[in-house]
Amino acid sequence: MIKKVLIANRGEIAVRIIRACKELGIETVAVFSEADKEALHVQIADEAYCIGPKLSKDSYLNTTNIISTAKKTGSDAIHPGYGFLAENADFAELCRECNIIFIGPSPEAINKMGTKDVARETMRKAGVPIVPGSKGIIKDTDEGVALANEMGYPVIIKATAGGGGKGIRVARTEEDLIKGINITQQEAATAFGNPGVYIEKFIEDFRHVEIQVMADNHGNAIHLGERDCTVQRRLQKLVEETPSPALDGEIRAEMGQAAVTAALAVNYSGAGTVEFIYDYVNRKYYFMEMNTRIQVEHPVTEMVTGVDLIKEQIKVASGNKLSLSQEDVTFNGWSIECRINAENPEKNFMPSAGKIQMYLPPGGYGVRVDSAAYPGYSIPPYYDSMIAKLIVHASTREEAIEKMKRALGEFVIEGISTTIPFHIKLLQHEQFVSGEFNTKFLEIYDVMNS
């Protein structure tokens, strides 16, 4: 079993991992940038070391300093969390070369799923449904135009190395397409160091449904149900729930099996998420991508299954078999998560860095808060704006919505602006309450002024 883990991350996910390690009797090492010396993960870990200046590229992405800190502290494993180095195959390979366990899949699996055009082709061969589109990277704009004419507009241009809503453009005309391909290639070369793009048919009316999978190094893989992440703003998720109000039992079982097939096709191990576009009008689903890491929204799955996904990741990385089979997985009730960001929803979600003067999280039965915030904590402006995740669990969707409204009303954060007022309005919106909406929900409805 792993004895000591270095957590190569910050914020709430670093705190979450440290807590899981402590319960497993594993020692923890926190790393931090100069801007994060007062951060909560630094205070609760057994040891903590500064790995560089405030900017991510000099600290949380500084592989040399992270590996040398792991070696210096005698850490036998590194947990990358999400973001930063979590889906970096080179870093996973570096860990392997240095005899450090990377708590995640193999570099080969990350490569296969991280390069989006390769992932598409792998899924096609495995029989997992994919959106109609190019077979691999397009050579030039001529090929793109020919494909788009064949499929029909609109089409979506995607950077093969992109992710997190970046490197994506929709084209509705040939002119849009030519311009879009050129711009996306340039942006992708700068942002990801890989100019490759591919195109897909753009399905306009869909829901974003993802399946949580878990696999070990002994050939076992299971799914732990779906999460509906349809409420998004600028391709960034804001609210997640499980089960999805749009799925029936038959589609749920099919998608779950497709996700397991996807994981087995790349010899996957650890926690992963297979994202699907769900065309609910025609009851068809298509593979979108696989995230080869733990997701921000993993707690909703934990609430309905009772499985601690972080602990399971650590056990699997230690060489253990999965602690449960597909038959052992049961789903109980409904869970919703709201991402509380340091942003001002009244001012077009403008980031709001600063000092938290008062912090009073909600409590009560079925309420969970995953956060690294505390009174007096200054939010650095250099990283992601999420400061807390508020998760509720209840018997039904209606009860979960009421519980979330109560919890949001109790949540006090003063000194900065947060998205709490937005979430309160969203949960009162009749379209959200009905459960019938698509990814354009926030484009169609002005939630703040409704």
Model-derived regions, located:
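ATP-dependent carboxylate activation and anion-phosphoryl transfer catalytic cores
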Residues: 2, 7-24, 48, 71-73, ...
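Short secondary-structure boundary/hinge segments and terminal tails
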Residues: 38-39, 87-88, 113, 140-142, ...
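N-terminal nucleotide-binding beta1-loop-alpha1 segment
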Residues: 159
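ATP-binding N-terminal substructure of ATP-dependent carboxylate-amine bond-forming enzymes
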Residues: 1-126, 138-146
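Conserved beta3 strand of the protein kinase N-lobe
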Residues: 133-134
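A generic structural signal for short coil/turn motifs at secondary-structure boundaries
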Residues: 57-58, 110, 167, 298-300
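Acidic/histidine-enriched active-site and ligand-binding environments that engage anionic O-linkages
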Residues: 147-156
